[in-house]
UniProtKB/Swiss-Prot annotation:
PANTHER family: LARGE RIBOSOMAL SUBUNIT PROTEIN BL34M, MITOCHONDRIAL RIBOSOMAL PROTEIN 34 FAMILY MEMBER. Gene3D superfamilies: 1.10.287.3980. GO terms for cellular component: ribonucleoprotein complex; ribosome. GO terms for molecular function: structural constituent of ribosome. It comes from Ureaplasma parvum serovar 3 (strain ATCC 700970). This is Large ribosomal subunit protein bL34. The keyword Ribonucleoprotein applies.
Length: 48
């Protein structure tokens, strides 16, 4: 049986990236909460 996690950086950014989060109201809420919590990394695409 195939495993569920098949790594793919492009898909990762498209689904969980900063621009993907900014597209929706809820995504922006996620970013706001992570800022309030003081997360070291906001999204997977902000690793640079």
């Amino acid at each position: 049986m195939k495993r569920t996690f098949q790594p793919n950086n492009r898909k990762r950014a498209k689904v969980h990236g900063f621009r993907a989060r900014m597209k929706t109201k809820n995504g922006r809420n996620v970013l706001a909460r992570r800022r309030l919590k003081g997360r070291h990394s906001l999204t997977v695409s902000s690793e640079k």
